[in-house]
Amino acid sequence: MAKQFIYPFTFGDKSQSDLLGGKGANIAEMVQMGLPVPPGFTITTEACREFLSSGTVPAQLTEQIHKSLSNLEKAVGKNFGDPLNPLLVSVRSGAKHSMPGMMETVLNVGITPEVAEALAQSSGNQRFAWDSYRRFIDMFGRIVCDLPDEIVHKIENSFLLKANAKVVADLPVESLKELAQQLILAIQEHTGQDFPKNPIDHLTQSIEAVFRSWNSERAQLYRRRERIPSDLGTAVNIQSMVFGNLSDDSGTGVAFTRNPATGEKGSYGDYLDKAQGEDVVAGIRNTMSLADMAKKEPIVHAELERLMKTLEDHYRDLCDIEFTVERGKLWILQTRVGKRTAEAAFRIATQLVDEGKISMDEALLRTGGDQLAQLMFPQFDLSESRNLIATGIPASPGAAVGEVVFDSKRAFDLAKNGRKVILVRRETSPDDLVGMVAAEGILTSRGGKTSHAAVVARGMGKTAVCGTESISVD
């Protein structure tokens, strides 16, 4: 009997994270709850383990991908790779245990120059179409083809300087088209092969890249630190795209049902209009708070607050939620029980007991000795006068002192020799994990409360300040 490597989002629930991964299991749970989740399917952790063991995609998996893609096309009424009515998908990792930012994601899979041109015509928005195409080429190049970040940044910076723009998404439409072509040329030079043109090849190669990312250096480092077994593998979630970069009433965000840094009640998170999801966690642009989102999009914000309460009541815990707004419609992309600081863990557990959502015994099980030790984090003596250089967002509490270091590898090398360091970056990426682990604290000039630096620092119990806009980091 053939193994089943793929399940639609309509199958399963949150208890099946061994098979579907945490993300896939929680997506299935939300579908069962009737929440607005873009349709898709999950490739199981077993498929990943077989791929990593053999080095090739199982033949049965290839057949099941084609069948599942056909079923998804029927569900959404669009066709993958068809310029007249295109279906685009995201390809995202989803291991049993949350590993924020440690594995890979490829967005806008299925887009080609022909599809981009058709999207520009049908949406009436050239920028949206070609920005989406540029984003796909960028991600495919770095993640699938191993194009070094330095090459990507060098090409992007040349366009930014020429256009006097701060971020790539602000480039003129013609520059976005030209940038995508320059990236393709760089990919071809780097790989020695022609850039694939068939969207099915884009999809299968993206899936393989996500499988491989389970064994990336940073993923292995994170697993060792968090004591996550190395033989689990990751599931892969294929989800139909909804576009936060489509229009003025579109955007993307990350929300927590309570403050993951302090445990205070009340929604907490970041929102970016005219953006795609990776922009928020990457910290490339400074975000607006959910309170500011409420002023800009009051109806959508009210719906988000309602769904946040629904999810927290259902999970009986702090929930971390990724969402996208497309032309005023709210979509929930994923949820998980959110990582939090030790202070927040104790406060939230106490609150949930007081609210009758969990028992005292369950609250004790949710708090451990490691978190108790973290509660003793140092603080500065505020009674002494200090020269304040800059202020930012208190992403993870505590106080830290050390040499300022701008490079993660150097931070690691200095810390290995017994020197205390503060890692200072414009924004952190998953590749900075080695420096973040080594540093006493983390400071970024960009990013918000849910950026990569903030989420990872909270999970590790590291002091972090993000979005210090008055500091310029070269």
Language model: regions and residue ranges:
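Nucleotide/phosphate-binding sheet-loop regions of phosphoryl- and nucleotidyl-transfer enzymes
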Residues: M1-N387, D413, R419-I422, E427-V434, ...
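Short, flexible loop segments at the rims of nucleotide/cofactor-binding pockets, characterized by
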Residues: V401-G402, K420, I442-L443
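Long, structured protein-protein interaction/assembly regions in large complexes
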Residues: A400, V404-R410
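Residues forming the flavin
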Residues: G461-K462
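NTP/phosphate- and nucleic-acid-binding module
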Residues: P397, V401, A415
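Generic beta-sheet signal
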Residues: S445, V465-T468
